[in-house]
Amino acid sequence: MKKFTLIALFLGCLAILGASCTTNSGPTTNTSSAAGNLRLAFVTNNTSDFWTIARRGTEKADNELDDVTVEFRLPADGTAAEQKRMIDDLLAKGVDGIAVSPVDPENQTQTLNDTAKRVLVVTQDSDAPKSDRAFYVGTDNVAAGRVAGGLIKEALPQGGKVMLFVGKLDARNAQERLQGIREALQGSNIQILDVRTDDTDRVRAKSNVSDTLVKYPDVAGLVGLWSYNGPAILSAVQDANKTGAVKIVAFDEEDNTLNGVKQGAIYATVVQQPFEFGYQAIKMMRQYLKGDKSAVPASKQVFVPTLVIKKDNVDDFTTKINQLRGR
């Protein structure tokens, strides 16, 4: 079995494949790829349990592909600066490709472009379409936001005020989910009060919710856009003895989120398929580096469908997701 390296730091999904290159026409083939062996890296944007599932996908691809070795990294502080340090280190180690989830796509464009001159660069989870990345693998986040907006309307048929929570609004996936929610709520009797950010600080994520419950005692709904926001919202609502009185819509499948759905404390969660992010990113990078680009559409965006988890299907989903987590 090929060696699979996990370095526990924090980041979003980035896939870069390739080797050193001397022109702007894209990555050239290095010694290892010319010999048929590829070293691929997957870089996340934080250390959420979400990425544990993505890692299982990369491991499956790693085990299936005899000519591929995968290195998995999580940036501890979830910053663009740490992502750059990781990418520089991976380049120094001679990887052929990197799949990354850019924390701040707009301000990381130059870093991604410089990297793409040397190796194959792929984005996952959060896209950077203005960069020279080869393609994106992940959720259609505008569509996912529309789904979340529809769930908010279901949970609040009489309307009301809602607050949204997310780590960073610089991330494209956050921006697009917010866009989708706003589109879905347009013309409804639901008012978005604001979007509170926490810079991926879990303590701050919860305090943002607690502060909202005090400042806006009539708030009817709370929406978490990133995976850890769901548990943070749930914990703050429980502490305030407002379980059931305030409707919660979340994203992703952290344990406490699924438990909250099962208990009826969370109305629903929109789950992505991070296993497929990892699995497809590695397989497609290999295929791309081997010269076969047929799997990449003209849009350069490979969308993985989302699922809606409510009380009636949470048990079955939890069983399946725990299998992916190796539990």
Predicted regions span which residues?
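Periplasmic-binding protein-like
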Residues: 41-44, 94-102, 122-124, 163-166, ...
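Short beta-strand elements at the ligand-binding edges of bilobed clamshell
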Residues: 72, 129-151, 164-168, 195, ...
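Hydrophobic alpha-helical segments within soluble ligand-binding/sensing domains
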Residues: 83, 137-162, 204-206, 253-257, ...
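Hydrophobic alpha-helical
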Residues: 99-115, 181, 199-260
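Flexible loop/hinge segments that line or gate small-molecule binding clefts
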Residues: 105-143, 161, 252-262, 266-267, ...
